[in-house]
From Swiss-Prot:
Subunit and interaction comment: Homodimer. Interacts with ATP7B. Interacts with ATP7A. Interacts (via dimer form) with SLC31A1 (via C-terminal domain); this interaction improves ATOX1 stability and controls intracellular Cu(I) levels.
GO biological process: copper ion transport
The protein's name: Copper transport protein ATOX1
GO cellular component: cytosol
Residues with PTM Phosphoserine: 47
Segments forming a coiled coil: none
Residues annotated as binding Cu cation: 12, 15
One of the Pfam families matching this protein, by short name: HMA
Described function: Binds and deliver cytosolic copper to the copper ATPase proteins. May be important in cellular antioxidant defense.
Keywords: Acetylation, Chaperone, Copper, Copper transport, Ion transport, Metal-binding, Phosphoprotein, Transport
Cysteine pairs bridged by disulfides in the record: none
Protein source organism: Bos taurus
Signal peptide: none
Any GO molecular function: metal ion binding
Amino acid sequence: MPKHEFSVDMTCEGCSNAVTRVLNKLGGVQFDIDLPNKKVCINSEHSVDTLLETLGKTGKAVSYLGPK
């Protein structure tokens, strides 16, 4: 399963909870949230575009850092 790393502008636990909510709703993903470094690593067969769109639903600034 491909692993991707994203930068997400998270500042608190509420932000990381929002990321957890949207990714769990998408399904088919395993992920780790690194709140201090504002990064999310996702293992998923979903496309990068789908993952970006899903993370964008949190209302936070999101960018794709590349494969991990």
